[in-house]
């Protein structure tokens, strides 16, 4: 009896002892080559990503060089190395602090022949160190390439390829690979590029060029012949570091591959030679905002001191953000986005449609506009739409109560366009110069018939607003807020994005308009728009508390829609005639 009980325990103990005796395979050694110039704006996020790589630091070496800086790149790197350098197998630190620019350089983003050569020499020096140290691999990653996937190094090593790059996303169609190259060494467009970039085909693909971030194996005879500098004896292509190395691989019979089977991270779009470091920084901030929406976000290193942000309201009296308390992730993303752009904002807790019932609505004096139906589905007003309207309404009341001359209103699902802050500031400066009388300016909306909208004379960035959907971002004047409140909309409510076109007399339904007078709101819109929704109906991440909700007068909890109306679609689909009686003209594009 006792033996029968003891036997399973002995068997289990034996299994544990055998498991303990099996040691984990030793991971390959890798040199992380860091070559930085004028990278103060991106270094905190770049270094933070390197810190979070899921790889034993004892198997990693740091080879770090910096030169010709006009900012605090050297100081940041020195601070970071002092904090984390001891955790790595070895550290090479090569700062060049004397020269701030190259001869004949027109600006910090101008690539002269001497600059290309110096970069190639540095990469060659890093490669020589890796070989002498006996490393298995060397990873080159530009300092504005942020590897948000902490498995990147392991995933690339597992491919067992001589030169392999993780495909990086950017603000545009730009990435770190070419699918085609001309006989002269220039970029060639191919049919494969966009399906690869858009991940319509996924895997690892052989390409003639990878650059910016790539892993180079040091374990094969072929790669032992590779060099960044000097160029191959037969080289006659342009004197450019990435093209020189692509030719070296071709001459040595070494294949290059790009992998897009995972989301590895992000890269900043390259600025033009005449552009400034400030413009590059602005681009990188937009990249941070895109990562906050699409995920995973970029996280800065805690071991680097960053310049403090100087928050302001951009010349407005207040910046409001409408956000549901039960959507903390959306609120956090929105506040992080505004912080990155140095915008100070006041959070307004949105009225939650889930908390509304008939008695509350009766107490507030809320009643449905007679005859209102959704222009597509024919459904009535939802409690989510009532909550949204009341949230905006509370801001209009605050604007009037505080006498705020002009404000900005954001919902918490805004995707900001590039250079949002400066473009908005410039737009408002132009409006002031032209002495335009305005009540409301859309910054983000869904245009229904954009071809019918008229440009504002003297203001090329502005149009007279036509019938539009969404209220995700707009500016509002004190006079505009007074007009909206004076119409007493709570007693004849419709969705707020239908109400606004009624008030500037551009709604196609005359029956709705008949209940409001005067309809003299002076409404305009930025063109091009400065904001769009983070997601659309049909996207995996799409979430709406207005589209999917209960009927406004139904306390049973029954939902009107599980999929969202056509208003929330990415495509136009605006050619249908809804049961509400107004038809929507078709148009060929959905311009947000």
Curated annotation (Swiss-Prot):
SUPFAM superfamilies named in the record? Nucleotide-diphospho-sugar transferases
Please list where the region (Disordered) is annotated: 540-592
- Single GO MF annotation: identical protein binding
Q: Which residues form a coiled coil?
A: none
Motif Prevents secretion from ER: positions: 589-592
- Going by the UniProt annotation, this protein carries glycans at 72, 150, 234, 357
Gene Ontology annotations of biological process type: cell adhesion
Top-level taxon: Eukaryota
Q: What's the name of the protein? A: Inactive glycosyltransferase 25 family member 3
